[in-house]
Amino acid sequence: MIEENQLISHLYQNRDNGQWMIQTNDEHQKGVADMAASFAGQFGLPSWGRALGLLHDKGKERAAFQQYIRKMNGLPTSDKKRYDDHTHAFVGGILAKELMGKDVSHLLVNQIISHHTGLHDFGDVGNILKERLLSKEINEGDISINNPLLFQEFIDSPFSKSKVEWKHFHHLSRMLFSCLVDADRLDTERFMDVESWRKRGNSATLADLLPQLEAYMQKLQSNAADTKVNRIRQQVKEQCSRTSSSEKGFYSLTVPTGGGKTLSSLLWAMKHAVSHSMNRIIIAIPYTSIIVQTAGLLKEIFGEENVLEHHSNFDPDDIKDEENREKAKLATENWDYPIIVTTNVQLFESMFSNKTSDCRKLHNMANSILVLDEVQMLPTGFLRPIVDALEAYQEMFGVSVLFTTASQPVLSGLIEGTNPKADFKGIEHIKEIIPEEFALHDQLRRVKLSIDDTGKTYDEIAAKVSEYNKVLCIVNTRKDAKELYDRLPNDGVKLHLSRMMCPAHLHETIGKIKTLLKDESQPIVRVIATQLVEAGVDIDFPV
């Protein structure tokens, strides 16, 4: 039996017995407040998260909303008045401003009024509230704060009295928004869809996973031949392990191709995370072809239940295990996994978005490690906002950032823009993990360059390529790749790699090439590729 004076937040009818299951607004707001406080506590602002949770759905206590939710579910209501507006989010924003004042509430109001629609432009928030205050609907007198003392912890918090750097303001705004949005969705799911709720979380911690990585790397070392390259890889690994307990901050790992950068950077990140009790590792990569390769390796080490792929070419339905498949689908919403492998686009679009679906995951980046692989591929036209964002996440949200590449770009000091007015100051301190005395570029110089500056025809280049049995030829354009491929003889296997191929075909072909190169019964393997193989695709050719 639903009482007329019950303030309903969510309800559904039990399929088995027809009984109405009610979540009161008080229950929902307290549940959201507890979760949002836990999320915001990761960057030292639990009282801010709690305030957001306690206020975000106060508008559901309006008569208009209570009539609406009952009518939508076919329930009787004694209130016969007609209400034109049953929206609710703006009410919490108005109460936040009244309760906490203009100076303190500016980092709460937008999050509350936007938690269903997406963040508004900061300059529009005042006008939105003004319009609502002038409307008749807000004058019902059916909303109030039962216990204003609940918010005293927030009002008295040192941070509420401090000033946020303007360039960091919008990142803090999004981070608080993320805490509220995810807490709201999760608490609703806990009541409305308990089966999905139970599938979330329960992943291993990074401390649980570290021994698996160490055992995997030890096995590789035990089976490796005593060569100069393998000794250098071991040296890089030991240096990463030795420096991993350093304080949180910005780090770079500059290791030439073949130096074991992928596993050594992961070892540094995991040991750094464990030493600082950090939550997860997020690896951002510019190309999906490298992501598939990296994610495959990580799943081999840690199991697919602990590694989340999140990019446009990954379909969770391809995961064979049903439990892992459903967990991965849910985790793409909020990145609640110990290890995430994603694209630069997915990462930075989320960091600068106003959408609820994009921002929801952001709070799970707090107190985590961000590994930017092939960092030289960051778009120069967006470098300034990217640097500002990374500084904000490091300074305010306890993130450590590791830049990995064979050739580090300039990210510190004065960075030149497209014109003198666009010049900006880069990251102040980036600590390189590999000391100069290692001289890795000299030690790993295994390529002999022969430069011929005379022009060559397609036929001449094809003839030159055909002189070798196992050879990779990299050209500038897809047209060049096609022309050369068509001119190669058919005496053996010839393949091409370019963005003309769909991602699945590209991934399949790269795997085929790796297999063929190990197959002694297949002496001729010639590949024509565009520049997509130049950044992180793990293929070794003699020529």
Located regions from the model:
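Conserved helicase motor
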Residues: H10-D16, E309-E322, N476-K479, K494-K514, ...
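Conserved strand-helix element at the start of the C-terminal RecA-like helicase core
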Residues: R280-I291, K464-P489, K494-H496
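Inter-Walker segment of RecA-like/P-loop motor cores
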Residues: G303-F352
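Interdomain hinge/linker at the junction between the two RecA-like core domains of SF2 helicases
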Residues: S407-E467
